[in-house]
A protein has these predicted regions:
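Intrinsically disordered, low-complexity, charged terminal extensions of DNA damage-control enzymes
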Residues: 1-3, 40-41
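Nucleic acid-binding interface residues in structured DNA/RNA-binding domains
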Residues: 3-10, 55, 64-151, 155-157
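Broad, structure-driven detector of short, well-ordered beta-strand segments within folded domains
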Residues: 13-18
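Compact structured core domains
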Residues: 20-69
Length: 160
């Protein structure tokens, strides 16, 4: 069973979702692909991992780096899972590009070429935004391209 709850952030309402295995979704309400992976059979409620996610978000939105990560249950293809794993390795306060992630992924896969556009598609479908930091990925020209930036005042990825 998937449980959901809402979190009021400085950037707007966020829907949190989790099942028995961990966090399955963190979406801003205006975000592209909002709740795309939320099963129809979900209910509003609470469970420990949702509380952990709220505490993580409280720390994050206070301007500090959280020293823990809520348990995650990322649901997606092997390719998307590999990209999301790389996102989790981007240090707080730093950014990288889609091209750099594509090169990293190619190295992991024995040199098999990966396009930056394919990486961008996986980043854009990240179901656990903020916690899995897709906002730390920028275009090759340094532009903000993350789908989280639907808010009128996005956070600076270089400081988060």
């Amino acid at each position: 069973m998937t449980y959901t709850m809402h979190y009021d952030s400085p950037l707007g309402k966020i829907l949190l979702a989790a099942d028995e295995e961990g966090m399955t979704g963190v979406w801003f309400e205006a975000q592209k692909y909002f709740a795309a992976k939320l099963p129809p059979e979900h209910e509003e409620g609470t469970m420990p991992v949702l509380g952990d996610a709220c505490r993580w978000l409280d720390v994050y939105f206070s301007g500090r780096e959280p020293d823990f990560t809520p348990k995650l249950h990322l649901i997606g293809s092997d390719f998307r899972q590999a990209v999301w794993a790389l996102l989790l390795q981007i240090p707080y306060g730093q950014t990288t590009t889609y091209g750099a992630l594509a090169k990293q992924l190619a190295e992991i896969n024995g040199g098999k070429r990966v396009s930056a556009q394919a990486v961008g598609g996986a980043v854009g479908h990240n179901p656990v935004s903020i916690i899995v930091p897709c906002h730390r990925v920028v275009g090759s020209d340094g532009s903000l391209t993350c789908l989280l930036y639907t808010s009128p005042s996005p956070r600076d990825p270089k400081t988060s």
